[in-house]
Curated annotation (Swiss-Prot):
Cofactors: FAD
Job of this protein: Catalyzes the folate-dependent formation of 5-methyl-uridine at position 54 (M-5-U54) in all tRNAs.
Keywords for the protein's UniProt record, in alphabetical order: Cytoplasm, FAD, Flavoprotein, Methyltransferase, NAD, NADP, Transferase, tRNA processing
Primary residence: cytoplasm
Biological source species: Geotalea daltonii (strain DSM 22248 / JCM 15807 / FRC-32)
Keyword NADP: yes
Annotated GO biological process: tRNA methylation; tRNA wobble uridine modification
UniProt-recorded name of the protein: Methylenetetrahydrofolate--tRNA-(uracil-5-)-methyltransferase TrmFO
InterPro entries documented for this protein: FAD/NAD-bd_sf, MnmG-rel, MnmG-rel_CS, MnmG_N, TrmFO
Residues binding FAD, per UniProt: 10-15
Length: 437
């Protein structure tokens, strides 16, 4: 009987959520967790679903997409959300938890479920047969990573280099102009924020004086030239950025016909053109400093940053290259991935991916049709993004309203998020009715 069980590698947020969802649908699960036999450098608690960084699950308001995602998971019977609500601590408008009680809650639920068997010990390779979910997290062990690489080839990464992303409707197009360097491509593939000499020097000075995030011992990264933090490039000399990611050559401002002193380029992040990332602006600046300093860029003074930059240890796959929207490997559909290893960023997003993977392995085991939530929902928007964006520039992403399809007709900006949330919950209810197991 054990050979027929769904195998889930990793007892973190995604793995536990996937195990719960599959078991609740009548499918037997074997959940593998390497603790307490072996700990990663970031883990300390012996239980399942350990929160290794902050104890905050971020805001609850539907004005934030992560709040909507939590509401969708709550309405869908998520173990992760049930645990969070049962172990919450005061945190203003955020949902924060007692991390020990949170882990204890999930460990108790998982270990006492009649259809879940927890096996402790490291899994060194993906099983050669049967349905498997890989949810081994950002600190996947070296041996398992080597096994994963046999299925993913060169599309497995060990460090992320995330540049900030802003919403298109928050960019001042009176200052930014569209153009590609030397008119290549379609000629207007990039947004360009021009700087004069005074603005550039003030910007570099701000970068050099900005507060940085201290790296943890297990996150010591050797930076390659093409992946250097923007502030470390600035440390090489005052003109370095002008001859690197901010070089103005081949980008004359159409309003003056003259090349600016320096240029910050923004590249379209999604097909709908609602999001743009700051090209080459991977950074270790703190989030508050990023908002302050990057708002000095002409055209971004009032930018809405939906993702801020970071660089840290993070094992993840190139999801749009490798995964179907069902979280199955395209070339080996019996294998699914879930959690941060898929390129979702954040606790709630990891649990959400585990939720979907768990539903789909249950359907796969029963011979049913697999399912994907509508892209108008927070779950669906996130899934759609990580499995459909440009494979060349893929980096982990958190849920945000910039991922959602636009609303039809004119909507006031102050009402937009409420309307997006209302549409999402309506479409979620309809989808739930269609996929009742």
């Amino acid at each position: 009987m054990n050979n027929n069980k769904i195998k889930i590698i990793g007892g973190g947020l995604a793995g536990c959520e996937a195990a719960w969802q599959a078991a609740e649908r009548g499918v037997a699960v074997k959940l593998h967790e390497m603790k307490p036999e072996r700990y990663s450098p970031a883990h300390h608690l012996p239980g399942l679903a350990e929160l290794v960084c902050s104890n905050s699950l971020r805001g609850e308001s539907l004005d934030n997409a992560v709040g909507l995602l939590k509401e969708e998971l709550k309405r869908s019977g998520s173990l992760f959300i049930a645990a969070a609500l049962a172990t919450r601590v005061p945190a203003g408008g955020a949902l924060a938890v007692d991390r020990q009680l949170f882990s204890d809650y999930i460990t108790e639920k998982i270990t006492n479920h009649p259809l879940i068997e927890v096996v402790y010990g490291e899994v060194a390779q993906i099983p050669e047969e049967g349905i498997v979910i890989v949810a081994s997290g950002p600190l996947t062990s070296d041996r398992l990573a080597a096994s994963i690489a046999t299925h993913t080839g060169n599309y497995l990464y060990f460090y992320d280099a995330i540049a900030p992303i802003v919403t298109a409707d928050s960019i001042d197009f009176g200052k930014a102009f569209r153009a590609s360097r030397y008119g290549k491509g379609d000629g207007d593939d990039y947004l360009n924020c021009p700087m004069d000499e005074t603005t550039y020097k003030a910007f570099v000075a701000a970068l050099l004086g900005g507060d940085k995030v201290a790296a943890k011992d297990f996150e010591k990264v050797v930076h390659f030239e093409g992946c250097m933090p923007i502030e470390e490039m600035a440390e090489r000399g005052p003109e370095t950025l002008r001859f690197g990611p901010m070089k103005p050559v081949g980008l004359p401002d159409p309003r003056t016909g003259v090349e600016p002193y320096a240029v910050v380029q923004l590249r379209q992040e999604n097909r709908d053109g609602t999001l743009f990332n700051l090209v080459g602006f991977q950074t270790k600046l703190t989030y508050s400093e990023q908002k302050r300093i990057f708002s000095l860029i002409p055209g971004l003074e009032h930018a809405d940053f939906v993702r801020l930059g970071s660089m840290h240890r993070n094992t993840f796959i190139n999801a749009p290259q490798l995964l179907l929207p069902t979280f199955q490997l395209k070339n080996t559909p019996r294998i699914l991935f879930a959690g941060q290893i898929t390129g979702v960023e954040g606790y709630v997003e990891s649990a959400g991916s585990g939720f979907m993977a768990g539903i789909n392995v249950a359907r796969l085991a029963k011979g049913g049709a697999l399912t994907v939530p509508p892209p108008t929902t927070a779950l669906g928007a996130l899934v759609h993004h990580i499995t459909s964006v440009d494979t060349k520039h893929f980096q982990p992403m958190n849920v945000n309203y910039g991922l959602f399809p636009e609303l039809g007709g004119k909507v006031k900006k102050k009402d937009k998020r409420a309307r997006l949330a209302e549409r999402a919950l309506t479409d979620l209810t309809e989808w739930q009715g269609m996929v009742q197991d």
